[in-house]
Amino acid sequence: MKTISKQLSAVIFPFIFSACVSQSASSLNHQTAAKARVELALSYLQQNNPQLAKINLDKALQHDKNYYLVHSALAHYYQQQGQIENAFREYEIAVNLNHKQGDVHNNFGTFLCSQKKFEQAQQQFELALNSPNYYHQADTFENIVLCAYSAQKMDIYQQTLEKLRQIDGKRAEKFNSLK
């Protein structure tokens, strides 16, 4: 499961950032500042510096506590720190703040799968795939394949692997060794 968790983590956060919708100049400035802090925090997490990551996430919250991206990044931070309840809470906040963000649904699904909550994960993956302006279907299909494999849901594994093969055959090939 460790290998699958690492693979899931590698797939979920390269595309956390999404475009902002048009808003007032003031709220956009707050959102821009919050996004900059989130980017710094994610950099610090990659450098294995959770203390500076958390400081920047807290500052991002001060800039815009109603920005889904801040809560999504906080969820990722808590997940990395093993604070499962906090991660779950932050994913729920992020989804409630903007339910149209496929990336958040995909990441939440990956988190739920890592917690062995397969059915809930599947729901989040479906929401991701059905989100408007979501362009990372291959990532989500890959996450579904990994999740189904870890849950021993071989019918879903095979069906989704075929979907992945149709849109990104090269990605699907790496699963040949899992059979």
Curated annotation (Swiss-Prot):
Superkingdom, natural source: Bacteria
Residues making up the signal peptide according to the UniProt record: 1-27
SUPFAM superfamilies: TPR-like
Pfam families attached to this UniProt entry: TPR_8
Gene3D superfamilies hit by this protein: Tetratricopeptide repeat domain
Alphabetized UniProt keyword annotations: Signal
Claim: Signal is one of the keywords in the record: yes
Keyword Signal: yes
Protein name: Uncharacterized protein HI_0366
High-level lineage: Bacteria, Pseudomonadati, Pseudomonadota, Gammaproteobacteria, Pasteurellales
